[in-house]
Structures are given as C-alpha cells and as structure tokens.
Amino acid sequence: MKAVSVIVDSCVIFPMPLCDTLLCAAEAELYCVHFSQEILDGATRNLVKKGRMTEFKAARFQEMIKNTFPEAMVEVPASLVEAMTNHPGDRHVLAAAIIANAKIIVTDNLKHFPKKALEPYWIEAQHPDVFLTQLFDNDPESIVEVIRQQAEELKKPPLTVAELIDNLEKNNRVPEFVSRVRLYEYCNLVIETAKKALTVLGTPAAEGGRSYEGGRYRLWMKGQTLTITAKDSRGEILRVQNMEIEGSISSEDVKLFQIFAQRLEQELATNGVE
C-alpha cells in the first residue's frame, strides 16, 4: 500500500523533538513527506529567532532535509496561492498540498485551515497528535521503532527512549501519541513487575484473587485480569483483561516500577526465592 502524501507545516517543524519524530517517521516510509521552500523558510526563521540555531546552521538544516527527502520539495505558483480561501498567512501551505497531491496537512494552526477551504481538494488538516496517533494505530511496532532509533541517534545530549518520550510530552503537544507509545514500550515491564509482586508479596483479596497494597499503587489480579490503581486522583492506570491491555501510565509510573522491579529482584536474591 502506497504511503499517504503529507504536507508538514512550518509550525510543527519548529519544535525540534516533534520535528525529529515526524521526519524520522517519514524516513521510515510510514508516510510521504512534502514541503515548499516557504514552509522550510518559516520553520528555520523561527529557529533562528528563538536562538535555537544560527543562520549558518539553519541553512545546513534545510540542506539536510532536502538531501534526506529529495522528492519532498514542491514549487508553488503564486497564482494558485492567490486562489486559496483559507487564512491568508497559510494559503501557501494549502497550495503546496494541492501541488503535492497530499491528503493531509499536519499543523498546529487548525483554525487556519477550515474544512470549507479544504474540502474541494479532498485535503484534511490534522493536529500532529492526531496524525502521529494514526500512524501508531496503523503500525505500532514501526512507529515505536522510529522512537527507539531516534533516541539511539541522539548524542548531544544522549537520551534514553523514556527521556525522549518525556521531551515529546513537554507542553502537552502530542499527549495521546505519547501515552500510547509509553504504554506500548513499557507495559511489559510494569505488568511483569506487578505479577511478580503479587506472587511474592500479595495477599488474598476480599473480591477474590490476590492484591498488594503499596504506598502509591494497589495491585490486584484474579485469573487473567490484572489491574493497577494509582493512589492519587487518577485511579486505575492499567488493566489487562481478555489478553488486551488498556490504560495510561506516566513517566513517573515507569520510573517507580523500574525501581520496584530492582527491589523485588534484590529481595528474591536475598531470601533465595525464585
């Protein structure tokens, strides 16, 4: 199946962790990315203005994008831009989408792309959270592998997968995508730690099965159903039932379960329990 063609607006190229994820996903051929020169200029102009890059580095950044995606650039005639009816500041983006035969414009500025202006061209504007979440739903392992590879290639500073996910979470830019990626990447760690804790430390529960009351979480398991409930305002954060996993775990949850797993291993080793 041919990857969908997408125009990426300058406003989502500007935040670097998000830009990297979008470009890495395109490099992995999860979608076909397109830009115009005006879109790239808008992105690098903001990067220079905010002090994130010098003019020289901005030029090299553009060159890198063009070299990585040689088929991505589209030339947009001024006459087509003038014919667009969306927000004047982003008419060049819609025109670029038409030239690229793109089906989606990924943008933070959804209000600049009203449906009425896009429908004649069968184009949809999507928030980056919606777009990345759709990529996840289509192929979870591939998009999570993109995140793993992205983390592996970051050197200044080096980042773990967990730290990269935390960076994407900042400013609440792509919350649903982050939630799904984190659960996919770390659910096995959390679930196996919970099961081990219930086996070693759990006691019979009033509702049947076994439970463990920790300082921050209540673990409960009966048959093939496992729940983890946070002792804060969130309530249940993870449920395994009928071979399906549902929930939303935070960065702090992952860290605490990693520590808990280490302590369990130490306790088992000390007590000689397998």
Where are these regions (language model features)?
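PIN-domain endoribonuclease scaffold, especially VapC-family toxins
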Residues: H34-P77, V144, Q150-N172
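Intrinsically disordered, low-complexity regulatory segments enriched in Ser/Thr/Pro
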Residues: L219-I259
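Negatively charged, low-complexity tracts enriched in Asp/Glu with abundant Ser/Thr
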Residues: L189-R216
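Active-site neighborhoods of divalent-metal-dependent phosphate/nucleic-acid chemistry enzymes
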Residues: P70-I104, N138, L154-P158, N167-N188
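PIN/NYN-family metal-dependent endoribonuclease catalytic core
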Residues: S5, M16-K50
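Mixed-charge, Lys/Arg-enriched low-complexity segments
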Residues: T193-A197, N242-E274
